[in-house]
């Protein structure tokens, strides 16, 4: 008798994706982040669903409804902080996952990579509209500043901004539609993640060496299921520690003040995971230029497969490229720090230099290093 998991139409799909999937025998813990992202997504959808049961998307009651969730709903404070800090964990895993792809040349699976970039943009959009919902000062002013950037688009900009706002300022209509977007987008992300996985399983996983993986494959279960469970436990432990001991560590105190259109906070800044892009936006003293740089800071990922000059796929045996990769990581951390600082000397010039270095590393220095390493191979 054949096993049901290999014959049943639904079970077969799950079996081919998570049980009998041939997986390279040498993938490291950097390959854990894919499953951790899936876990984060499920956690965010579940906590979000319970929050949506008590939240009211209305300017007069939104802030109070969040306070009500934290004070009166059974374990409401826990669900709310799991959701808020879960977003931070989501982005940590996301950036680690992208970093792994860059380091080991996983971007050469172009369809998988491009869907991944699309996923990144969708998750960023979801996090942005979600940050507006508590209707605190930073929610309101963050929404105002970021949506206002669209007014930099020539000719149609102002009309577009008012269309998104649903009026002449960020108001009730904006909050209601942002709640609708925040509810629907995670399900779109889930569908995109399934397509991401579908394309990945067409080619199979990459591995740290960058050579073809089909030399030595092992079944996903039990080897990598147990490894993924370890990663999941560490993720949950970190999230619980963050949520139960320092729930407001990554948040902004300004968001505990109800939104007030008549008083602007001293420093308007997004959540930490957007600070690098915000620093790039601010470093260009021109509205349209800043918006284009902001977009390009994410969309530059699409061009990475086209900029592959090295004959080796992975950076495992490429010391020059490794040096540039870790310089890029340090540069992104610098940009994240600058994004949270006020616009004054010396932060302005540091931000501008870090922004130039960011694009220079990805578009010029890394491809050049690849060519140099090719030459060195011939020695």
Swiss-Prot record:
Component of the ubiquinol-cytochrome c reductase complex (complex III or cytochrome b-c1 complex) that is part of the mitochondrial respiratory chain. The b-c1 complex mediates electron transfer from ubiquinol to cytochrome c. Contributes to the generation of a proton gradient across the mitochondrial membrane that is then used for ATP synthesis. It is found in: Mitochondrion inner membrane. The keyword Mitochondrion applies. The cytochrome bc1 complex contains 11 subunits: 3 respiratory subunits (MT-CYB, CYC1 and UQCRFS1), 2 core proteins (UQCRC1 and UQCRC2) and 6 low-molecular weight proteins (UQCRH/QCR6, UQCRB/QCR7, UQCRQ/QCR8, UQCR10/QCR9, UQCR11/QCR10 and a cleavage product of UQCRFS1). This cytochrome bc1 complex then forms a dimer. GO terms for cellular component: mitochondrial inner membrane; respiratory chain complex III. Binds 2 heme b groups non-covalently. It is a multi-pass membrane protein. PANTHER family: CYTOCHROME B. A ubiquinone binds at residue 201. Signal peptide: none annotated. This is Cytochrome b. InterPro entries: Cyt_b/b6_C, Cyt_b/b6_C_sf, Cyt_b/b6_N, Cytb/b6-like_sf, Cytochrome_b, Cytochrome_b_C_euk/bac, Cytochrome_b_N_euk/bac, Di-haem_cyt_TM. Heme b b562 binds at residues 83, 182. The keyword Transit peptide does not apply. Keywords: Electron transport, Heme, Iron, Membrane, Metal-binding, Mitochondrion, Mitochondrion inner membrane, Respiratory chain, Transmembrane, Transmembrane helix, Transport, Ubiquinone. Its main location: mitochondrion. CDD domains: cytochrome_b_C, Cytochrome_b_N. GO terms for molecular function: metal ion binding; ubiquinol-cytochrome-c reductase activity. Belongs to the cytochrome b family. It comes from Lagenodelphis hosei (Fraser's dolphin). GO terms for biological process: mitochondrial electron transport, ubiquinol to cytochrome c. Heme 1 (or BL or b562) is low-potential and absorbs at about 562 nm, and heme 2 (or BH or b566) is high-potential and absorbs at about 566 nm. Heme b b566 binds at residues 97, 196. It comes from the Eukaryota.
